C-alpha cells in the first residue's frame, strides 16, 4: 500500500515537472531555483512534492480533483496561492505560509472561513463561488486589501469587516444581503474604493433590487471610485447622492417633528382637561384653608386673651370670671373640632387631586405609548430610504375597513367575559410595506405553487390573515416589533420554548392572542399591589396581522414536539382551540386555531392594529374610565362623579360653630394699623403678626418690628417678598395663597425655620432654590406645593439636595434614602472631568448615517471616551462631541478647554442661560431643547454653527443681531417658545430649515422678514397666532415665500402655488408697505408710491392708520378698479396711469340678457353695435348720479393709458370734489358722465377717439378752466357753449378742416389760450387771423403769444379785403336786382368757383347757374355786415384773402 502511494506520488511529481518544464530526474537540483509552479485541469489529484521547491513563491492549481489543502508546510516563502475550481471543503494547512500575500480559493466547496489567523501579510483573498454563509475569521488580516466573497450564501455583513481597515476592493455579489442597514457597516472601511454587490457575472443581491440602492451606497461610502463595475468617481455623482440623502433627512426630520407636535397637542389637551377637573378641588381646598387660617388666628387670639386675663385678674374677681373662662374653653374646643373637620375635608379634596393626577399620568403614558411607534417607523423609513414604508389608514381606505372587520370578526365576547370586556374598538391601523420581505414572500410562494398541484381549488385558500402571538411575559416592545417589521420573523422571536424558535406562532382568534397577556398583567399588578388605574393598561393592545401561506398543513399530534423534524413533509401545523382551552361556553371555539409555520419567509407582516377594549365600569370614582379619557368639563362633578353628599358635607362643615364674622380687609399697612393688630405700643414687643385674609401687596413700616418671630401674610395680594428682608429674627413665615412670582429680594432671614410658599406663582426652579439656599440657612420646614414650577419632576430632589437643613418638604418627612438620592442627583448637576469623559467622543467626522438624531448623540453612542482617556496628554482638545442630555444641569461650565468641540447637546436640563460656550469656536451643531432659557446669547463667536435647536424653552424674542455672524447656519429650530417676532432672521441667508411652531407670531409682517431667505425650503409655523389671524394663511405664506417646498409638515403642491398666486398675486397690503418701510407706523405716512409691481388689488387695513396719506402713485400696475383706495379718507392726488381701470368700484359681470352686439359695444364702443341700447342700459344700470359720493378729498386724478372706453361705467360722477382729471391715452369716444364734477377745473382727454361732443357732454354750466383734446378725431366743435369759464383749450392734432368749426369757439368768451396746430385747417394760414378777430380775449395761439401788432395786422388785413370782396360780389351780381334796404342790399345766394391755388389769387370763373346757399361763415366783423349772416366763402376764395394779406405784409416790411 505504501509502495503504491509512493508510486502515485512519483507519477504526480513527474506530471508536475512535465507541466512546468522541469526534469524529474534532477528536480532536486532544479527545485531550489524554481519560484513558480502551475497545474491546470488534471494530473494533480493531491498536493505533493512541494518539499522539493524550498523557494517557491507562487503556486497555481486550477480544476484539479483536490479535496484538501495539505503539503504546504515547507513552502515558507510562498506569497501567492491559487487552488481554484477544485473540491476543497475546508480551509486548512496554511498555518506555515506566513508570507502569503495572495490567496485564491474560488470555485470550491468551502462553507466556513477559518484557519487564516496567522496569515497577517495576506492582501488578496478570493473565496468566491463557495458555500460560505458567514463572514468570519478575518480579524487578524489587518493588511487585507482585496476580498472576493461573490457567489456565496452570505446574508449579513455585520461588524466582521471592521478590523480590515486597509480593505480597498470588496466583491459580495451573488449573496443574500437584503438590508440597507447592513451595508452601513462598510462605512468603517475608509479606504474602500471598489465595491461590487451586483457584478454582472453573478446574481445580484436582493438589496440591489431596492429603490435608491446606488444613492444609499454612494452617500455612506463617499470614497468609492467604482460601484458594481461602474465608474462613480465623478464629483457630480457624489454631490447628487449627498443632495438626495440630505433632502431625505430634512424631509423625515420634518415628519418626525410633526409627529412630536401632534403628541404635544394631545398632551396639552389632556393637561387642559386635568386643569378643568382640578379647578373644583382647588377651589374647595382654598376655601377650607382660608377658613382654617381664620380659625387658627381666632384661636391664637383667644389663647392670648385668656392668658392675659388670668395674669391680670385679682384673686377676689377670679371666681366671677370662672364662667367666662369656661365659655372660652368651650369656644376653643369648638374651634378645634371645626379645625379637625376642615382638615378632613382638605384631605378629602387633596385625595381627589391626587386621583386626577394619577389618571392624568396614566393617560399621558398611554398617549406616549400610542405615538411611541410613529417616530421609530419614520426613522426606519429613512434608514431604508423608503423601501420600508408605513402608512396610517383612514376610513377612506378599503384596507383600513377590512382590518377593522377582521378584528371584529375574530372577537368573541364570551372569551373576554371574565375580564369585564364587552367589546373592542380599533383606534389605528398602520400598513407595513416592506419591499424586500414581500419579494421574498412572493418568490417562496411562487415556488410552492410550482411544486404543488395548482389545479386544486382549495390550495389558494391556504393564504390566510393571522395574528402573531407575542410572548405574554414580554410586552410588545418597540425594538422587537421593529425587528419583525424590518427583517421578518426569522431570528426575531425571543420566546423561550424551542418550538417557537423554529416555527412562527400565529392564531386566528383575538382571545387566543390577548388572554395570556391580560392574565399576566393582572397577576403582575396584583403582586406589585398596583392601584386600579395601573391595571387599566391592558385595555389598550397592539396586534400584528400577517399574511400567511399555510401550504400543506396537518393537525398537531398529542405529546409530540412541534418541529420540522417531526413534521418533515408539511409547511405548517395547527392546534384547535379545544385542545388548548377545553372549557368553552360557545361554539366559536371550534373555529379557533393556533398555527405553527416552519418557513419564516412565508409569513409576511402587513398590518399593525392598535385597539381598545370597552369594559363594564365596576369601580365608581372621581373619573369615569369607561371612555378611557379624562372628562372635559368640571361641571361633570355635579352630575354624580362627585357625589352630592360630599358637597353638602362641605357646606355643613363650613356652617359648624363657631362661625367667625369676616373682618374688614386691609389695603395698606401703617404704624397705626400694626399697633392695633398687635395690641401693644412697643414695637420690640411684637413677636407675632397675623395679616391673613387681607388685600395687602406691600409690607411697609415693618422695619421697626425687630423682634418679630412669626408672620402670617397668607391670602393677600403679594407678588414679591422684598419687604421682609430686614426681619432678622423671623422664624415662621406663611406666605401661602398669594401671587408671588419671584423670591428676588428675599434675603437675610438666617433664623427662618418654617416657610410656606404654597399656592403662589413661582416658576424658576434654579433661581428660587439659590435664593433660599443663600438666605435661609436654618430652614427646617418648606412648603412649595401648587406652584407652576418649570421642572416639577426633579423639583423635590433639587430642593432636598440644595437645602441640607430641611426635615420636611411639602408636608412630608424627608427620609435618609431621599437625602442620599438628592445628594447623588446634585452631584450630577455639574460638569466635571468625569462627566466629560463619560459623555463625549473624539471622532473627527460625523458618521454618514441616515438619521435625524443630533450628531452628539450619534457619536457618543458609537464611540465614547474611556475612563482612562484623561491619562493621555491634552485630552480636552481631542473632544469633538459632547452629549449631556438629561443630566439636570443648572449651568454650563468647564468647557473652556474644549477648543475643538464640534457637536454638543444639552437637552432636558435646567439651564436658564446660554453661557460657557464662548470658547467653543468650532461648534457646528448645538442642541438645547427642553431647558428654561429665555434669551439667545453668547453665540456671536460661534461662526461655524450650522444647526441650532432650542425647542421647549422660554424664549420671548430674538435679539436683532443675534444671527448676523452665523454665516453657515442651515437649520434653526425654536419650537414651543414665546417668540413674537422674526425680524432677527432677516440676514440668515443660508437658512434651509426653520422650525418655529407653537410660538406667539401673530402678524403678517413676520412672514416678510423671511422673504430674503432664498435658500429656505422647509418652514414650520404651526400653532402660531398668525394661522388664525390670517385668512388663507397657508396660501399667503406660499405666495410670499415661493422657494418653500414644505410648510407646517406638509409638502407644497404645484396646485397650491397656483392658487396662492391667484389669491395674493398683485395685492398691495399693509404688510407689504411695512416690509419696505421697515416698520408698521403708517400714521406718519403722507405719500404712497408703489409703481410697476403688478398690483391688482389694494387692501390697506386698518384704514385709519393711513389717514394722513394724501398722495398715491400706483402707476404701471394691473388695477381694474380703485379697490381699497376708496377707503383712504384724505387722498388728494391719485395717479393710476398705465393700469386697466374699468370702474371706480369693481365691475359687475356682464348680464346674460345682453345681446352679443351690445356686449361688443361695451368692449369696443367704436364698433357702433348696440350703441343706443347699451348706452341706455348703462345709464339705467349704473345711475352714478344717484350713487353716494366717495373719496371727497380727492382733487387730482390721473387715469391715463388705462384702455378706458366708457366714462359712464367709470362712475367719475361720484368724485364730487375732483379738480383735475387726466384721461389721456385711452379709447374714449364720448365725453360723458362728468356732469356732477362741478368743481372740475382741468380735463385732459388727449390721445383718445373723440369725434364730436353729444348733447350731454357739457350740458351743465361748468367751472372748467382748461380742456385738453389733442390727438383725437374731432371734426366739429359744437355744443361747447356751457364752458363759460374755459380759459385754455388744446385742440392740436385733430381733424378739423373747416374754418366754420373754429367760428363756434366764439361762444367761449373767456378763452385765453388755444392750440389748433396739427389740424388740416392749419395748412391755411388765414385761420390765425380769423381766430384773432373772432376771439378778442385770446392771448396765445398755438403756443405763440398774441400781441397788439398781431391784432392790428389782422384788422388791417380784413379791412383791406373789404373793398376787394365788395367789388367781386358786385361784379357777380345778376342784372335784375331785388329790392334791398337802403343801407344794404341783401346778397343773393352764390358760390365762388375755386382758384387753382389757395395762396394764388388767380382769375375767377363765372358763377354757376344754380348757386348753393352757404351759411355759418366766419369772417371779420367789418366784412360780414356787407354779406349778411348766411354768406359763406369757399376755401378757394379764402386763398384770395390769404394772398392779399401776404402781399400787404410784404409791402409793409419793405417800407419799414
Curated annotation (Swiss-Prot):
InterPro entries: Leu-rich_rpt, Leu-rich_rpt_4, Leu-rich_rpt_typical-subtyp, LRR_dom_sf, SDS22/Internalin_LRR, U2A'_phosphoprotein32A_C
Domain of life: Eukaryota
Keywords, ordered alphabetically: Leucine-rich repeat, Phosphoprotein, Repeat
Pfam name, any one: LRR_8
LRR repeat intervals: 53-78, 97-119, 120-141, 142-164, 166-188, 190-212, 224-248, 264-287, 339-362, 661-683, 684-705, 706-727, 729-748, 749-772, 776-802, 806-833, 876-898, 899-920, 921-942, 943-965, 967-991, 993-1010, 1013-1037, 1082-1105, 1106-1128, 1129-1151, 1191-1214, 1215-1237, 1238-1260, 1262-1283, 1284-1307, 1309-1335
A GO cellular-component term linked to this record: cytoplasm
Descriptive protein name: Leucine-rich repeat-containing protein 9
Amino acid at each position: 500500500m505504501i509502495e503504491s502511494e509512493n508510486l502515485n506520488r512519483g507519477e504526480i511529481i513527474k506530471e508536475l515537472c512535465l507541466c512546468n518544464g522541469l526534469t524529474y530526474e534532477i528536480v532536486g537540483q532544479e527545485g531550489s531555483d524554481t519560484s513558480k509552479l502551475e497545474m491546470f485541469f488534471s494530473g494533480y489529484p493531491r498536493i505533493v512534492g512541494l518539499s522539493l521547491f524550498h523557494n517557491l513563491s507562487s503556486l497555481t492549481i486550477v480544476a484539479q480533483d483536490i479535496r484538501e489543502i495539505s503539503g504546504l508546510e515547507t513552502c515558507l516563502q510562498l506569497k501567492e496561492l491559487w487552488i481554484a475550481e477544485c473540491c476543497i471543503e475546508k480551509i486548512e494547512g496554511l498555518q506555515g505560509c506566513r508570507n502569503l500575500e495572495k490567496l485564491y480559493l474560488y470555485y470550491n466547496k468551502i462553507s466556513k472561513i477559518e484557519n487564516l489567523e496567522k496569515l497577517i501579510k495576506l492582501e488578496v483573498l478570493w473565496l468566491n463561488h463557495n458555500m460560505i454563509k458567514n463572514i468570519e475569521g478575518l480579524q487578524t488580516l489587518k493588511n487585507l486589501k482585496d476580498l472576493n466573497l461573490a457567489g456565496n450564501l452570505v446574508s449579513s455583513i455585520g461588524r466582521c469587516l471592521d478590523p480590515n481597515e486597509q480593505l480597498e476592493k470588496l466583491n459580495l455579489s451573488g449573496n443574500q444581503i437584503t438590508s440597507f442597514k447592513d451595508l452601513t457597516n462598510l462605512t468603517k472601511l475608509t479606504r474602500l474604493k471598489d465595491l461590487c454587490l451586483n457584478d454582472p457575472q453573478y446574481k445580484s443581491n436582493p438589496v440591489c433590487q431596492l429603490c435608491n440602492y446606488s444613492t444609499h451606497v454612494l452617500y455612506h461610502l463617499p470614497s468609492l471610485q467604482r460601484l458594481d463595475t461602474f465608474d462613480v468617481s465623478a464629483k457630480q455623482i457624489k454631490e447628487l447622492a449627498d443632495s438626495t440623502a440630505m433632502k431625505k433627512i430634512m424631509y423625515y426630520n420634518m415628519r418626525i417633528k410633526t409627529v412630536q407636535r401632534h403628541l404635544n397637542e394631545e398632551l396639552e389637551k389632556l393637561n387642559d382637561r386635568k386643569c378643568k377637573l382640578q379647578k373644583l378641588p382647588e377651589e374647595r381646598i382654598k376655601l377650607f384653608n382660608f377658613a382654617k387660617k381664620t380659625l387658627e388666628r381666632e384661636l391664637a387670639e383667644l389663647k392670648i386673651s385668656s392668658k392675659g386675663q388670668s395674669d391680670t385678674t385679682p384673686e377676689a374677681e377670679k371666681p366671677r370670671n370662672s364662667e367666662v373662662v369656661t365659655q372660652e374653653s368651650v369656644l376653643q374646643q369648638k374651634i378645634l373640632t371645626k379645625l379637625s373637620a376642615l382638615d378632613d375635608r382638605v384631605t378629602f379634596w387633596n385625595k381627589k387631586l391626587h386621583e386626577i393626577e394619577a389618571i392624568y399620568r396614566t393617560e399621558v403614558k398611554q398617549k406616549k405609548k400610542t405615538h411611541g411607534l410613529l417616530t421609530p417607523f419614520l426613522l426606519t423609513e429613512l434608514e431604508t430610504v423608503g423601501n420600508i414604508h408605513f402608512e396610517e389608514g383612514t376610513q377612506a381606505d378599503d384596507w383600513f375597513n377590512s382590518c377593522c372587520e377582521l378584528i371584529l370578526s375574530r372577537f368573541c365576547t364570551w372569551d373576554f367575559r371574565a375580564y369585564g370586556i364587552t367589546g373592542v374598538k380599533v383606534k389605528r391601523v398602520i400598513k407595513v410595506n416592506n419591499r424586500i420581505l414581500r419579494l421574498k414572500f412572493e418568490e417562496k410562494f411562487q415556488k410552492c405553487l410550482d411544486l404543488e398541484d395548482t389545479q386544486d381549488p382549495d390550495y389558494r385558500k391556504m393564504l390566510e390573515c393571522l395574528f402573531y402571538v407575542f410572548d405574554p411575559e414580554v410586552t410588545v416592545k418597540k425594538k422587537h416589533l421593529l425587528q419583525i417589521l424590518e427583517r421578518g420573523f426569522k431570528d426575531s422571536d425571543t420566546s423561550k420554548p424551542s418550538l417557537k424558535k423554529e416555527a412562527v406562532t400565529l392564531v386566528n382568534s383575538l382571545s387566543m392572542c390577548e388572554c395570556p397577556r391580560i392574565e399576566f398583567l393582572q397577576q403582575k399588578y396584583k403582586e406589585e399591589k398596583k392601584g386600579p388605574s395601573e391595571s387599566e393598561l391592558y385595555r389598550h393592545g397592539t396586534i400584528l396581522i400577517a399574511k400567511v401561506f399555510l401550504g400543506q398543513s396537518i393537525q398537531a399530534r398529542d405529546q409530540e414536539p412541534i418541529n420540522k423534524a417531526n413534521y418533515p413533509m408539511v409547511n405548517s401545523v395547527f392546534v384547535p382551540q379545544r385542545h388548548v382551552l377545553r372549557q368553552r361556553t360557545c361554539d366559536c371555539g371550534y373555529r379557533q386555531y393556533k398555527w405553527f409555520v416552519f418557513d419564516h419567509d412565508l409569513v409576511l407582516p402587513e398590518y399593525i392594529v392598535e385597539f381598545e377594549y370597552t369594559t363594564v365600569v365596576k369601580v365608581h370614582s372621581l373619573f369615569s374610565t369607561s371612555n378611557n379619557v379624562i372628562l372635559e368639563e368640571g361641571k361633570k362633578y355635579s352630575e354624580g362623579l362627585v357625589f352630592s353628599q360630599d358637597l353638602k358635607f362641605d357646606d355643613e362643615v363650613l356652617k359648624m360653630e363657631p362661625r367667625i364674622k369676616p373682618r374688614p380687609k386691609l389695603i395698606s399697612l401703617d404704624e397705626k394699623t400694626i399697633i392695633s393688630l398687635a395690641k401693644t405700643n412697643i414695637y420690640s414687643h411684637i413677636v407675632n403678626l397675623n395679616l391673613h385674609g387681607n388685600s395687602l401687596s406691600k409690607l411697609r413700616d415693618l422695619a421697626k418690628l425687630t423682634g418679630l418671630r412669626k408672620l402670617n401674610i397668607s391670602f393677600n395680594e403679594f407678588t414679591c417678598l422684598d419687604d421682609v428682608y430686614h426681619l432678622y429674627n423671623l422664624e415662621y413665615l406663611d406666605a401661602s395663597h398669594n401671587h408671588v412670582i419671584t423670591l428676588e429680594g428675599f434675603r437675610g432671614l438666617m433664623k427662618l425655620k418654617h416657610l410656606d410658599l404654597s399656592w403662589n406663582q413661582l416658576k424658576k426652579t434654579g433661581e428660587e432654590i439659590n435664593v433660599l439656599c443663600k438666605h435661609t440657612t436654618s430652614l427646617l420646614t418648606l412648603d412649595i406645593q401648587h406652584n407652576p414650577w418649570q421642572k416639577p419632576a426633579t423639583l423635590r430632589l433639587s430642593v432636598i439636595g440644595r437645602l441640607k437643613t430641611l426635615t420636611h418638604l411639602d408636608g412630608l418627612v424627608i427620609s435618609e434614602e431621599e437625602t442620599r438620592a438628592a445628594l447623588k442627583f446634585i452631584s450630577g448637576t455639574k460638569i466635571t472631568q468625569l462627566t466629560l469623559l463619560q459623555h463625549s467622543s473624539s471622532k473627527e467626522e460625523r458618521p454618514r448615517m441616515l438619521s435625524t438624531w443630533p450628531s452628539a448623540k450619534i457619536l457618543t453612542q458609537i464611540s465614547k471616551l474611556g475612563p482612562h482617556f484623561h491619562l493621555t496628554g491634552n485630552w480636552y482638545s481631542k473632544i469633538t462631541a459632547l452629549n449631556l442630555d438629561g443630566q439636570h444641569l443648572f449651568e454650563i461650565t468647564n468647557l473652556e478647554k474644549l477648543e475643538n468641540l464640534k457637536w454638543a447637546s444639552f437637552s432636558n436640563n435646567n439651564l436658564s442661560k446660554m453661557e460657557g460656550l464662548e470658547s467653543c469656536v468650532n461648534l457646528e451643531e448645538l442642541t438645547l431643547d427642553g431647558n428654561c432659557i429665555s434669551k439667545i446669547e453668547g453665540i456671536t463667536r460661534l461662526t461655524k454653527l450650522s444647526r441650532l435647536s432650542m425647542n421647549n424653552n422660554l424664549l420671548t424674542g430674538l435679539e436683532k443681531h443675534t444671527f448676523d455672524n452665523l454665516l453657515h447656519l442651515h437649520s434653526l429650530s425654536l419650537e414651543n417658545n414665546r417668540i413674537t417676532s422674526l425680524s432677527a432672521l432677516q440676514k440668515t441667508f443660508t437658512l434651509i430649515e426653520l422650525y418655529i411652531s407653537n410660538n406667539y407670531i401673530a402678524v403678517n409682517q413676520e412672514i416678510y422678514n423671511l422673504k430674503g431667505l432664498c435658500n429656505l425650503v422647509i418652514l414650520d409655523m404651526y400653532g402660531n397666532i398668525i394661522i388664525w389671524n390670517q385668512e388663507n394663511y397657508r396660501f399667503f405664506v406660499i405666495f410670499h415665500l415661493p422657494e418653500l417646498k414644505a410648510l407646517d409638515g406638509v409638502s407644497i403642491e404645484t396646485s397650491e402655488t397656483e392658487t396662492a398666486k391667484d389669491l395674493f398675486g398683485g395685492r398691495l397690503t399693509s404688510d407689504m408697505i411695512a416690509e419696505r418701510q421697515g416698520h408698521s407706523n403708517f400714521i406718519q405716512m403722507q405719500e404712497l408710491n408703489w409703481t410697476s409691481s403688478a398690483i391688482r388689488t389694494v387692501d390697506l387695513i386698518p384704514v385709519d392708520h393711513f389717514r394722513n396719506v394724501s398722495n398715491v402713485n400706483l402707476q404701471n400696475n394691473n388695477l381694474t378698479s380703485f379697490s381699497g383706495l376708496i377707503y383712504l379718507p384724505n387722498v388728494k392726488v391719485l395717479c393710476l396711469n398705465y393700469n386697466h381701470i374699468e370702474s371706480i368700484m369693481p365691475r359687475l359681470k356682464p348680464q346674460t340678457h345682453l345681446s352679443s352686439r351690445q356686449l361688443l359695444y361695451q368692449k369696443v364702443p367704436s364698433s357702433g353695435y348696440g350703441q343706443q341700447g347699451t348706452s341706455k342700459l348703462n345709464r339705467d344700470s349704473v345711475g352714478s348720479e344717484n350713487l353716494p359720493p366717495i373719496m371727497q378729498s380727492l382733487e387730482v386724478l390721473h387715469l391715463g393709458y388705462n384702455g378706458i372706453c366708457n366714462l359712464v361705467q367709470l362712475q367719475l360722477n361720484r368724485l364730487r370734489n375732483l379738480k383735475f382729471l387726466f384721461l389721456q391715452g385711452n379709447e374714449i369716444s364720448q365725453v360723458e358722465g362728468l356732469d356732477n364734477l362741478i368743481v372740475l377745473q382741468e380735463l385732459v382727454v388727449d390721445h383718445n377717439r373723440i369725434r364730436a361732443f353729444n348733447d350731454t357732454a357739457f350740458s351743465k354750466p361748468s367751472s372748467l378752466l382748461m380742456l385738453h383734446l389733442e390727438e383725437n378725431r374731432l371734426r366739429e366743435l359744437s355744443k361747447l357753449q356751457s364752458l363759460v369759464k374755459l380759459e385754455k383749450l388744446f385742440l392740436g392734432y385733430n381733424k378739423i378742416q373747416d374754418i366754420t368749426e373754429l367760428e363756434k369757439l366764439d361762444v367761449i368768451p373767456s378763452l385765453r389760450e388755444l392750440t389748433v396746430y396739427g389740424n388740416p385747417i392749419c395748412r391755411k394760414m388765414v385761420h390765425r387771423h380769423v381766430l384773432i378777430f373772432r376771439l378778442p380775449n385770446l392771448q396765445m395761439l398755438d403756443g405763440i403769444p398774441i400781441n397788439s401788432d398781431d391784432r392790428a395786422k389782422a384788422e388791417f388785413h380784413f379791412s383791406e379785403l373789404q373793398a376787394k370782396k365788395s367789388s367781386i360780389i358786385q361784379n357777380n351780381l345778376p342784372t335784375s336786382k331785388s329790392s334791398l334796404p337802403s343801407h344794404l342790399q341783401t346778397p343773393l345766394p352764390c358760390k365762388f368757383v375755386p382758384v387753382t391755388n389757395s395762396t394764388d389769387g388767380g382769375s375767377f370763373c363765372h358763377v354757376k347757374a344754380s348757386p348753393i346757399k352757404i351759411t355759418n361763415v366766419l369772417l371779420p366783423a367789418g366784412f360780414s355786415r356787407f354779406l349778411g349772416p348766411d354768406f359763406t366763402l369757399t376755401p378757394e376764395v379764402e386763398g384770395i384773402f390769404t394772398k392779399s394779406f401776404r402781399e400787404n405784409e410784404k409791402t409793409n416790411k419793405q417800407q419799414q
